[in-house]
Amino acid sequence: MKASPHRPTKVLIHLGAIRQNIQQMGAHIPQGTLKWAVVKANAYGHGAVAVAKAIQDDVDGFCVSNIDEAIELRQAGLSKPILILGVSEIEAVALAKEYDFTLTVAGLEWIQALLDKEVDLTGLTVHLKIDSGMGRIGFREASEVEQAQDLLQQHGVRVEGIFTHFATADEESDDYFNAQLERFKTILASMKEVPELVHASNSATTLWHVETIFNAVRMGDAMYGLNPSGAVLDLPYDLIPALTLESALVHVKTVPAGACMGYGATYQADSEQVIATVPIGYADGWTRDMQNFSVLVDGQACPIVGRVSMDQITIRLPKLYPLGTKVTLIGSNGDKEITATQVATYRVTINYEVVCLLSDRIPREYY
């Protein structure tokens, strides 16, 4: 979607906050642990290239979801190691070698498909993915891991790492987490040669299970100042939210009692009211279920009245304000704050989704 810089709606990204969060997390993990920054999905909506450039001296490498995200970083001049976390198409192997990416290997079938097509694997670097209980991708049996490692090494592949991903590291109960950890450790113990890099720590594990860190961590949600558990667990130390979403009033009017707002006429004023229009809607990632949620104007909570439209919302103001008055949807305004987690709670979702859904139509500004 094409960015719309000629309207007041924008996402502000505090790059210094991201760097401080990395340093804060780094101070609470074992010395010498490698720090990999997860910048997939456009850095969780924060802007992959801008974020990666800002933090490249603070991390040891980057993690992305797919080959295209990795190419974007290389073409922007980023030279640090890049691990592609998802399963790549067979055709991506040549690109991985050309751009010096590290691929994830998650099954014997993928390896066999490469061998059947006689793909030259010499010089390729990979990490083996273990499905210890997440249930998405990865090896589940130690025998398959051993077979994969042997096959890859026989064909000139450097098996640099092995990793898993915890499903419940951000929850109160540790039972399933511990079961996953034991499955992963069992596979490691069965290997004739454990790869150089062993990593199982996503943001939640890095925050709440420091004792289980191997020799690398993958910093994702928390790096951007978000609590991976939402409101379930308190952060063990302070992190700074890096993202602010703001817009401005573009139309202000006084309406009489009985006036209706929005599609379906779902809101009817019960008295004379001041109603303002803000140019943001579900096409920007501000979803339809945000009706009745309050945004901030002049440090005051102002409810969204009527349904969220594709491009606009209407809000009820306590008084008349001039056009151009700032509206904060995520972030601080006066002495009040709206967090991505509060938005997520209202939507019955997670803060990851809230920031990832902010569309490319909204320009990102960095400071």
From Swiss-Prot:
Q: In the UniProt entry, which residues are flagged as the active site?
A: 40, 263
Q: Where does substrate bind?
A: 136, 310
Q: Which reaction does it catalyse?
A: L-alanine = D-alanine
Q: Name one GO biological process term.
A: peptidoglycan biosynthetic process
| Keyword line | Isomerase, Pyridoxal phosphate
Any one GO MF annotation of this record:
pyridoxal phosphate binding
CDD domains in the cross-refs: PLPDE_III_AR (cd00430)
User: Which positions carry N6-(pyridoxal phosphate)lysine?
Assistant: 40
- E.C. code: 5.1.1.1
Name the SUPFAM superfamilies for this protein.
Answer: Alanine racemase C-terminal domain-like (SSF50621), PLP-binding barrel (SSF51419)
Transmembrane stretches, by residue range?
none
Please name the SMART domains in this protein's record. Ala_racemase_C
Q: Which family, according to UniProt? A: Belongs to the alanine racemase family.
The protein's role, per its UniProt record:
Catalyzes the interconversion of L-alanine and D-alanine. May also act on other amino acids.
Name of this chain's protein: Alanine racemase
- What gene makes this protein? alr
